[in-house]
């Protein structure tokens, strides 16, 4: 790897659904080559060692720089549930090192959703409404193309928490504001049923946490 990149993975388990452990891969790059690098395990630094593996003990890698006053070093990170190579590919979604441009694009994409509702009222009530709407669209999460369990051309959504509650208002809201998103969520649920035999009421970490029946 060039001296401006770090890649690796971690195994994750636990959480409310008590699902199987899953792997999260990452690929990180900086806009400035590092002067030195190394890895660490526990409290021990290992300069110039470019690989490190462990199970249970905290492990990582680092890049070191000699910076001038007020110099900024930008970092961008791609993640994947498939591989480090896929994480690197996902990183291509960010085409610039300009943080302000990335921020502006993110704001624009969120406004495409938040602008679908216009209300009159005082500022406090508007903050409550748009904060709630923002929270509605944080999950389920669209992970299409990132299913580590089976190959499918169907949409892939994760982090359903939990449909026995969200069917009352959240999913009807999706149907009104973003019907294509709601349709893709339903297709994802059907695809989960086809491959795992159960329709989840709640799902996280690519695993069913709760099912009916």
Pin down the residues of each PLM region.
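Beta-sandwich/jelly-roll carbohydrate-recognition scaffolds of carbohydrate-active enzymes
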Residues: 1-160, 191
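Aromatic-rich carbohydrate-recognition surfaces in CAZymes
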Residues: 161-166, 170-213
